[in-house]
Amino acid sequence: MLIGLNSGGLAIVAQSAAIGTPNRWLNPVAVVDLDGDGRAEVAAVITPHLGGPLKVYRREGDALVELAALPGFSNHVFGSTELALSMPMVIDGTPRLLVPDARREQLRIIAFEHGRLVEVGRCALASPIVGAIQPVSQREVTVGLRGGPKLMAPGDCLK
């Protein structure tokens, strides 16, 4: 569901098909132009506690249309209020998505290329991600690990 301003108030401006079973949810990753066409895509992990897929949508009128999906992600810790366990980052001039794997033990670097989500890198971690991923500079982020925050440069993890 995409919320926007409509006649001076907030309103639903677009939505996707239902994600399935009741009481399931998704955790947004980013709204960003992933393919360089000047239009923003919406990325989210569906059912993050179940190691769900990362999906990318684009707004087409009042619909969010699914463009691509890739399985095996989790960007939320059950019971936590922290929702920022993933983020977009420009690496080598190209937008990428930083999203933990299903066990939150590796940080996957994902590109949207030719209409597909593709893993272009993976960073091994000393302990599971339990806190926010935050930008420090154009090249570095801090990752909230169970053992404490870690400074890293995701570009160093590209394949």
Regions found by a protein language model. Name each.
Residues 1-159:
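Beta-propeller-forming repeat regions
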